[in-house]
Amino acid sequence: MKSILVGLSLVLGLFVSGYGQKSKIYSEFAGEGEDRIEIIVVSGTPHQMGVELGRHLKNQARQSMEKYLHSAQKEDSVLCSLKNLLLAWKTNEPFMDKRFVEELTGFSEGSGIDLNFLKAAHAIPFISPYSCSGVDAWGKASGNGHLYQIRNLDYSTDAGLQDFPVVIVYKPTKGIAHANIGFSGMLSSHTGMNSKSIVLGEKGESPSAELPYDLHGKHFTILFRELLYDAKTLSDVERIIENSSLIKRYYLFVGDGKLKKGAAVKYLISTPDSVRFHKWRDMDKTDIHVPKVYNDITYYTMKNDQASKFFDEHYGHIGAPEMIKLSKLVASDGNLVDVVYDATSLEIWVANATDTQTASSREYVHIDLKKYFK
């Protein structure tokens, strides 16, 4: 599968701050038809990048976030009321990375979208239950020693997010260049990778029975932006996660794709319990949540038995095509977006749902992030 670039969008912008710093933005497209994805590259300070992204995305971001918020409120008008969402944001904001808050503020200024509206939309994942799939395979498990990751996001297409897919590549004045795979107007991260080959994915595990959730801590969608900015190694990722106050329950799949150092860790964040997190590496026989453990593989999917059978059949020969097959195999019926990473070569394959088909039924569009990280 090769990247199909459809022209360079004439959206090059330039912003000069009072300190002489410059921010730039441009975009181009990968994929065709309903599978087309906009790739936006932006540089500058967090606030500057937010302003530029807001200017560039203002029309589609407004549509995207309005649909998203309307869908959440239609599903649960009390839980997702504007008052409740803003309270959730206010409770959680002291734990947020300041760069993210600065970017969101800039996005509001650039787009003209009310900041409280954006805060409410970004708070929906804080208070909502969800489920997904995650896999890391590297070393002896892969055919070339590269580290591959799957991140399947299983979320309702009723929210319409699939109509607004974007890959935003950030090149901050301070921090590591990184890619956030998501949707117009959504600046938090459900998955991403940085130029140091750090790759991040998640599987939700918070049951609705535990509502309302305690929000006094970092939510993974904001934590991921912090990790993408700052983590150069897997050890950095582990240190930041383990020294952070976290919330809710979810699995985190974190990996470092650098050759000879490639490895991954699976976390179960369980902050409502006395033991607030569990950590497993490959071949950890204490991992009772999967039917079988393997060298150089960590996983937890919606269909673990099928995933294990797949590993038995393809072990030692796993590459991007095999991971795409596995992503399709373990996808649920409500499958919004799937991402396959080669964290070693800094490539991704992204599939987004349409109004009539799940992401796993669509084309996995190839994007080589190396060219954008330069």
What are these regions (language model features)?
Residues A123-D214, I222:
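Internal mixed beta-strand/loop scaffold within catalytic domains of large alpha/beta enzymes
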Residues Q21-S131, L228-K374:
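C-terminus-biased signal that marks the final domain/tail of proteins
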Residues E109, H216-G217:
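Gly/Pro-rich interdomain helix-loop hinge
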Residues M1-K22:
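Bacterial Sec-dependent N-terminal signal peptides
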Residues L12, A141, T173, G192, ...:
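A generic structural signal for short, solvent-exposed coil/turn residues
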Residues G7, F224-L227:
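General secondary-structure propensity
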Residues F220-L223, T233:
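Internal, well-ordered alpha-helical segments in soluble enzyme and binding-protein domains
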